[in-house]
């Protein structure tokens, strides 16, 4: 099994990578402002089986919101509904501020291609986070340190090649004999950009969709699969993330049900220091 250990960057190489710009992720999520719409382009570096990686699409939408001149505060939540396939090439983002008050903003984003129907529909909430009482009842899941875990072998999809997945528990065993009963859909793993990049809201958004489909774990095989609707909640702002100063997250994901072609997924993204950065949930289609 090729685990890429020989190609893992040394510490000095990692530092050098962090200084290089632009990162492939930033190139893939670049948007430009037009007269009334924002424009972006799909990236071959973040491609899935039949379209762009949904996490990169969501991060691109979030970038358009963060870069918008009317934006105030930090993201609290982003919901992305993948309405139709996205073709390779350029796309337009119609970004609208729906409602704003002194502390929060509500946004709507529609993605179209070539003047056609809406391919992706998103809603977002931004807010000014103010000092308050804080309490985190949940604790960081136990995990072998990142440096003591092996990288997961790369798969055919180009987007997978952009991440370093290191499973602590629940590594998918593709190619093994199908189980007589469904296996556990739970997994715990470290996720980082293969070329190190400081974790920010954009990378959190993308990583929240970087879990392999839960059905792949339960059935020990790849089946036709696609996210229909994804929501990610952010529990830190830009200042919190800057203080964490990290390039990797500890991620956990699980599912509660697979039924009549649809299954759920819930996940958490943690900093190595034990801070819960984001939680996420989605509903996905499968054919099996």
Would you name each region that the model predicts?
Residues 1, 7-11:
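A cross-taxon signal for low-complexity, glycine/charged-rich
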Residues 1-2, 17:
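Accessible peptide chain termini
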Residues 15-288:
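Terminal targeting signals and extreme-terminal segments of soluble enzymes
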């Amino acid at each position: 099994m090729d685990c890429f250990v020989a190609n893992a960057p040394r510490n000095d190489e990692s530092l050098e990578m962090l200084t290089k710009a632009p990162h492939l992720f930033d190139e893939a999520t670049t948007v430009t402002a037009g007269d009334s719409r924002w424009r972006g382009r799909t990236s071959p570096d973040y491609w899935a089986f039949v379209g762009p990686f949904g996490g990169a699409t969501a991060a691109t939408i979030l970038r358009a919101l963060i870069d918008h001149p009317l934006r105030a505060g930090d993201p609290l939540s982003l919901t992305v509904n993948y309405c139709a396939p996205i073709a390779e090439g350029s796309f337009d983002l119609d970004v609208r501020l729906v409602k704003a008050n002194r502390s929060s903003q509500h946004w709507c984003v529609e993605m179209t291609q070539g003047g056609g129907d809406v391919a992706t529909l998103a809603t977002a909430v931004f807010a000014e986070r103010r000092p308050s009482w804080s309490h985190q009842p949940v604790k960081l899941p136990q995990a072998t340190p990142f440096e003591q875990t092996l990288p997961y072998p790369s798969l055919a999809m180009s987007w997978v090649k952009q991440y370093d997945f290191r499973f602590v528990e629940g590594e998918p065993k593709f190619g093994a004999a199908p189980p007589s009963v469904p296996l556990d859909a739970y997994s715990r793993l470290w996720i980082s950009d293969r070329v190190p990049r400081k974790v920010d809201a954009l990378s959190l958004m993308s990583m929240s969709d970087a879990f392999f489909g839960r059905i792949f774990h339960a059935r020990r095989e790849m089946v036709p699969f696609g996210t229909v609707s994804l929501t990610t909640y952010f529990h830190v702002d830009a200042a919190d993330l800057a203080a964490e100063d990290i390039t990797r997250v500890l991620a956990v994901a699980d599912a509660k049900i697979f039924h009549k072609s649809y299954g759920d997924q819930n996940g958490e993204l943690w900093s190595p220091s034990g801070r819960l950065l984001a939680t996420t949930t989605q509903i996905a289609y499968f054919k099996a």
